[in-house]
Amino acid sequence: MLNLKKVKMILWDFDDTLCFHSDHSSPADEYDTEYNVKVINGEDAYSTCKMNYSIAKLMNWAVNEGKRQGLVSGVTCFIHARNKENWVKDHYGVALENFCVSSQEMKLGIMIAIAEAFGFEHDEILLVDDLWENLERAADNGFQSASPVEVINYVEEYFL
C-alpha cells in the first residue's frame, strides 16, 4: 500500500509508465536507427504514445506538495534521456530531475545513491515502474514501489 504522506521523492520510469506505447513492433534494425534519427532531428519519436491523466494528477499533486520527482529510465545514450525528459515536460507539464541509467538493474543503484545524497530514508522514495523486477528490487531494499496501474487506481480512489 502506498504511503504518500511519507514520500519525499517520486521516481518515474518512462516507457509504459509515463509514456504509454501503442506500437509494439520491433525496431527495423538492431540499432533502432529510425528512432535515433527522429531523436537526433528533434522529431516526435513517441507520436503513437499517450500520457495518462490520473498519473498527471499525482504528478501535479507532488509539485503542489513540494515533493521532488525524477525520471529513472533505462537509456543507451544521453539524447534518449533528454528526449524522454522533454516528452514528459511537453505532455505532463512537469520538469523531472534526470536520473536515467544505463540498465534496468542500475535503477536500484541510483535510488540508493539518491537516498544517501539527499538524506532520504529508503521508504521516503517511491519508484513507479511497469517492470515487476524493478518494483521487487526496490521493495526488497526498503523503497516504496508501485506499478502505473496501482498509481492510477490510487488516484481514482483517493484523489478526485
Give the location of each predicted region.
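Short catalytic/ligand-binding loop motif for oxyanion handling, primarily in non-cytosolic enzymes
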Residues: 18-22, 78-82, 107, 133-137, ...
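Short, acidic loop-to-helix structural element flanking the phosphoryl-transfer center
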Residues: 29-71, 78-82, 108-109
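Active-site neighborhood of HAD-like aspartate-dependent phosphohydrolases
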Residues: 1-50, 154
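Conserved Lys-Pro-Asp/Glu-containing loop-to-beta segment of HAD-superfamily phosphomonoesterases
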Residues: 107-133
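Short, structured coil segments at secondary-structure junctions
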Residues: 94-95, 140-143
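Short glycine/proline-centered loop/turn elements that form peptide/ligand docking sites
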Residues: 26-29, 111, 131-137, 147-158
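Structural beta-sheet core signal
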Residues: 71-73, 127
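A short, structured active-site edge motif that brings together acidic residues
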Residues: 74-77, 85, 91-110
